Amino acid sequence: MMMGNTFGSSLASLFFLWATIQQIFPNHLRIAIKEFLISTIQQLSFVQRFSDRFINFFSPYVEISFSQYEDYQFNHAFAAIETYLGAKATDKAKHLRASQVKESKGLVLKRDETKVRDEYEGGTVWWEMETDSTGYRTFKLTFHRRSRDIVTDSYIKYVFEEGKSIQAKSKQMKLFTNNPSSHWGTSKKSFWRYIDFEHPASFHTLAMDTKKKEEILNDLAAFSNGKEYYKKIGKAWKRGYLLHGPPGTGKSTMIAAMANHLNYSIYDLELTAIRNNSELRKLLTATSSKSIIVIEDIDCSLDLTGKRKKEKNLMTSREDGEQGTEEDKSFVTLSGLLNFIDGIWSACGQERIIIFTTNHFEKLDPALIRRGRMDMHIELSYCSFEAFKILAKNYLDLDTHPLFKKIESLLKETKIAPADVAENLMKKNTEIDADGSLKDLIQALEGKKKIHGAQVDEPKDKYTKKFYKAFCMSSKA
């Protein structure tokens, strides 16, 4: 009411002033004064507010703006919206824009149109992009006011999540390894170095029991889709896997297949290059979400008394061009590692998988591998006939062959790693056919059968056992 009185009295004063001007000033001065008064009225804040309210009263539409930059920082919401709108109905758009985005697998196609219409839960919204004089862009979302609750409560969140999901799928996966702390700078980026991860492994080509493979895939699916579930039960969104088995049974290939299946980058953590628990914490907090953190040969990397194996520490130091001094020794403890796996620091980041591998399951401390830390124990054993058939399909494109029965019989009688089977099936040159590769495998299996048949029970005395193992190794060589 007060604003209306102010507006009315001000308007009456202006009319009185204009009538006086018309009587006193000549025509050309009256025109100049009229233009001045009009511009002055337009600049009055209460007139602007009145006009805005007047327009909003009759307009049923609401508008939300998303700027490219907020407080001099890039607005990630803008990027998610741009990705969502760019990917939406690109097959129907008449104008497309192609670009090579950093960390993307290839060219990214986006709509090059400033206006996009979208449908959501029976309502219609309109997106429009505007560019100011400085080149900064802004997305404006327009919708009917009856859709306000749907748009603000769920539609905007849906756009953000879809945009981020599309970004993740097109992002180039990376393989990280930690730098020695002597190479660290002030930025967290200096903690890790990386290369593009382009391993071709997949669960389709993985040589293992089909039921076990399905069990792992179901577990990965439950984890990747379990954000709300983990939040509901009050646990950090992470999963632990222990891969154990003899050398050559596919532990590293399994990790690569998991990464490709989930589209996660891999952090290969070398514990021998870390001096203490504080450095370990800095490294792990610098990892990204949607990633796999791998510690291979955990039984060799971490001595369960809290001390590192000196030989491996010295070897790592020399590889990094450093001397194996006392200061270079690593003192990462078991408790320090466990604190990050399931302690208070485990909540740092989300949607992360932690994988330990070992060739010697029996050497591991039960505290390290108990359920809840390593949620799933996956044994990767010697090659079975079912695994062989997958390898035969991968390498020779064979579903069946007359020699398969003999190979099946030999696999039951001897132990051979899938990697050794694959080596025999791989064609060495163009002249070797499938028959030749299978015969090479049969010969290798028969050779192993003879060696295993000649072996006696392994002695239990530690001194005799030492010489026994040396004898077996020389026999295999």
Swiss-Prot record:
Q: Which UniProt keywords apply?
A: ATP-binding, Hydrolase, Magnesium, Nucleotide-binding, Signal
Q: Where is the signal peptide?
A: 1-26
Entry's InterPro entries?
Answer: AAA+_ATPase, AAA_N_dom, ATPase_AAA_core, ATPase_AAA_CS, Mitochondrial_chaperone_BCS1, P-loop_NTPase
Residues that coordinate or bind ATP: G245, P246, P247, G248, T249, G250, K251, S252
Disulfide-linked positions? none
Q: Which cofactor does it need?
A: Mg(2+)
Q: Which domain of life is it from?
A: Eukaryota
A molecular function GO annotation: ATP binding
What EC number(s) has UniProt assigned to this enzyme?
Answer: 3.6.1.-
Q: Which GO terms describe its biological process?
A: response to salt stress
Factors inducing expression: Induced in roots by salt stress.
Supply the Pfam families for this chain.
AAA, AAA_assoc
Provide the catalytic activity annotation.
ATP + H2O = ADP + phosphate + H(+)
Q: Which residues form a coiled coil?
A: none
Q: Which family does it belong to?
A: Belongs to the AAA ATPase family. BCS1 subfamily.
What is the name of the protein in this document? AAA-ATPase At3g28600
Q: What is the lineage of its organism?
A: Eukaryota, Viridiplantae, Streptophyta, Embryophyta, Tracheophyta
